């Protein structure tokens, strides 16, 4: 078996923990120079629903390996910050980066309600437990459907190697990544900070992600900063994969910034810190 490039899968699991290591670079100093790459806006369909996303391509005709990147829950175009920070890095290393916007966010804002508004409505109606149940309903339903529609678009693209499509994502996008790799045979997956804010308050979400990790159809690399909201997702989900005999890696990076929110932002503000580790895992 192989991952996304011509190198063998690691069957043994690897756990790298950096708690207590030297402090990571300051948040404002983590952006290494990356060749400028212009993003191309594209349209993809989910049944009758028209959705949009951005693609960063390497130079040349391809076909190339690709990563489908699931964004977080931020409103409007805020998630473009992650795409702009990460997409050019992949393109510079010969990978296509596809950032699809799910319904209600970014370039797909007109395609449906914003998930944050839906969760707030659930909270007003039924409290924290209702919000937790709504997270699972939406991320396993409409939003997973949007992810799989984006994957179908990638597989049809002539410049893509359909056997070399990885999936990644941060925060809610990390949750989407784990759910997606249960459904589809991606070549590899990267969950950055997925469920860190929701884990302790959402038992249904914990159960869904543990199930998905046990059933994962590709290896997963879990990473977080030491000062993220909660490190339990990485620990519990990697343990579930280990129990199921599935390949995985984990890495807990030194604190990023000073607050929990800073730590949670490592996935997009600190791409210079983790990119080489992720790229090694994918290849």
Can you say where each PLM-predicted feature lies in the sequence?
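Alpha/beta-hydrolase active-site loop
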Residues: 115-157
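Alpha/beta-hydrolase
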Residues: 70, 100-102, 192, 253
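C-terminal catalytic histidine-bearing segment of alpha/beta-hydrolase fold enzymes
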Residues: 247-283
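Primarily recognizes the serine-hydrolase "nucleophile elbow" in alpha/beta-hydrolase
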Residues: 139-215
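N-terminal cap/lid segment of alpha/beta-hydrolase-fold proteins
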Residues: 27-61
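Bacterial N-terminal signal peptides
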Residues: 9-20
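The feature captures the conserved acid-bearing segment of alpha/beta-hydrolase catalytic domains
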Residues: 188, 193-249
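Short substrate-entry loop that stabilizes the transition state in hydrolases
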Residues: 62-64, 72-109, 198-199, 230-231
């Amino acid at each position: 078996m192989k991952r996304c490039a011509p190198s063998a899968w690691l069957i043994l699991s690897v756990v790298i923990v950096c708690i207590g290591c030297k402090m990571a670079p300051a948040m404002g100093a983590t952006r290494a120079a990356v060749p400028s790459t212009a993003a191309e806006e594209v349209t993809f369909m989910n049944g009758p629903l028209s959705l949009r996303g951005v693609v960063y391509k390497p130079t040349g005709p391809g076909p190339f390996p690709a990563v489908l990147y699931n964004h977080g829950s931020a409103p409007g175009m805020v998630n473009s910050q992650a795409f702009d920070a990460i997409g050019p890095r992949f393109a510079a290393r010969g990978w296509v980066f596809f950032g699809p916007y799910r319904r209600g966010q970014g370039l797909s804002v007109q395609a449906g309600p914003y998930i944050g508004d839906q969760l707030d409505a659930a909270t007003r109606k039924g409290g924290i437990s209702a919000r937790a149940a709504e997270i699972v309903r939406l991320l396993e339903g409409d939003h997973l459907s949007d992810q799989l529609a984006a994957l179908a678009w990638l597989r049809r693209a002539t410049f893509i190697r359909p056997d070399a499509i990885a999936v990644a994502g941060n925060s809610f996008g990390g949750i989407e990544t784990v759910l997606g790799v249960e459904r589809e045979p991606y070549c590899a997956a990267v969950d950055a900070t997925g469920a860190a804010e929701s884990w302790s308050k959402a038992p249904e979400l914990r159960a869904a992600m543990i199930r998905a990790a046990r059933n994962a159809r590709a290896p997963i690399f879990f990473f977080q900063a030491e000062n993220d909201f909660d490190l339990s997702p990485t620990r519990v989900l990697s343990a579930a994969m280990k129990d199921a005999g599935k390949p995985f890696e984990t890495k807990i990076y030194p604190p990023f910034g000073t607050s929990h929110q800073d730590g949670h932002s490592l996935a997009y503000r600190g791409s210079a810190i983790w990119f080489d580790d992720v790229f090694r895992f994918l290849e």
